[in-house]
């Protein structure tokens, strides 16, 4: 997308996700006047990459978690006697193809809400993912697929007792609620990334991925159900790690990241006018 230039224009960047891809550090235009940063650790990392005009705000996307509207959640008619799981995978690399076969059995005793990335709906090379999940939801009573025109994942976080994801930003966003997280590391890689694995590794923020200690990691899809039941029965497991991670990855959990961003914008504008 083209960024409008001009002395009377202030360009602000608020990143849509805070996941595990190197694009977080590289996907920035020199025209950006101010960039929202979600944590002190990321602030230091961006500065080490030479980025400037940074504002430490927290993650604005998570602000609504402090006041959730239940109306959207009730439309699914969830079984109130069952625990609710949210599955929110990335589009690539994704765990969808690997976990697809396990979900029907998982849904026997849980509500399973599936929230797909926008690319899984609208990009041709990923559309098979949404087709797969549509079929699952149609055939299984307790599996609910969030409609493609519902972009906002935040309300679904609130209703979930547990999150399952992979390399998605959701594993950091869900930290806000201090609830169990399962991180699937079983991916279906493209052929070129299977053959030339270094190309795939180059795209990932491996040091950040390896430092994650607040999740239960899943390598074998056949172990998913036992991990889910363990997490639901012992939700306090890894709680201390999650609380530490909240401070590490989300700065402040006060619902005021957007206010800090607005204040940073106003300060920038005042400075530009002086």
Regions found by a protein language model. Name each.
Residues 126-172:
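Donor nucleotide-activated moiety binding/catalytic core segment of transferases
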Residues 11, 35, 163-164, 181:
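Short, well-ordered beta-strand core segments
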Residues 61-134, 146, 218, 232-233, ...:
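Conserved catalytic-core segment of nucleotide-activated headgroup transferases in glycan assembly
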Residues 4, 28, 105, 155-156:
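Structural alpha-helical scaffold elements that stabilize or flank donor/cofactor-binding regions
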Residues 48, 53, 169-249:
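Catalytic binding pocket for nucleotide-activated donors in carbohydrate/polymer assembly enzymes
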Residues 1-68:
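Active-site and donor-binding regions of nucleotide-sugar-utilizing enzymes
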Residues 9, 33, 83, 158-161:
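Conserved acidic residues
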Residues 254-274:
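C-terminal alpha-helical cap of glycosyltransferases
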């Amino acid at each position: 997308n083209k960024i409008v230039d001009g002395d009377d224009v202030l360009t602000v960047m608020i990143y849509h996700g805070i996941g595990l891809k190197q694009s977080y550090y590289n996907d920035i235009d020199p025209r950006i006047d101010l960039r929202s940063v979600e944590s002190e650790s990321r602030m230091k990392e961006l500065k080490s990459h030479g980025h400037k005009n940074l504002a430490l705000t927290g993650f604005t996307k998570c602000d609504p978690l402090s006041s959730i509207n239940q109306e959207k959640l009730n439309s699914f008619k969830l079984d109130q006697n069952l625990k609710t799981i949210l599955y929110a995978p990335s589009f690539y690399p994704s765990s969808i193809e690997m976990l697809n076969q396990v979900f029907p059995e998982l849904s026997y005793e849980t509500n399973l809400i599936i929230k797909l990335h926008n690319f899984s709906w609208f990009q041709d090379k990923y559309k098979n993912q949404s087709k797969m999940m549509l079929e699952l939801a149609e055939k299984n009573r307790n599996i609910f697929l969030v409609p493609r025109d519902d972009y906002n994942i935040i309300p679904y976080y609130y209703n979930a007792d547990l999150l399952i994801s992979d390399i998605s930003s959701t594993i950091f966003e869900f930290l806000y609620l201090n609830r169990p997280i399962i991180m699937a590391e079983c991916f279906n890689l493209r052929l070129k990334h299977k053959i030339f694995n270094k190309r795939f590794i180059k795209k990932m923020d491996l040091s950040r991925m390896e430092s994650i200690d607040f999740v239960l990691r899943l390598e074998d899809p056949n172990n998913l159900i036992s991990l889910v039941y363990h997490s639901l029965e012992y939700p306090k497991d890894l709680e201390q790690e999650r609380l530490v991670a909240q401070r590490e990855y989300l700065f402040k959990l006060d619902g005021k990241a957007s206010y800090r961003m607005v204040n940073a914008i106003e300060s920038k504008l005042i400075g530009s006018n002086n």
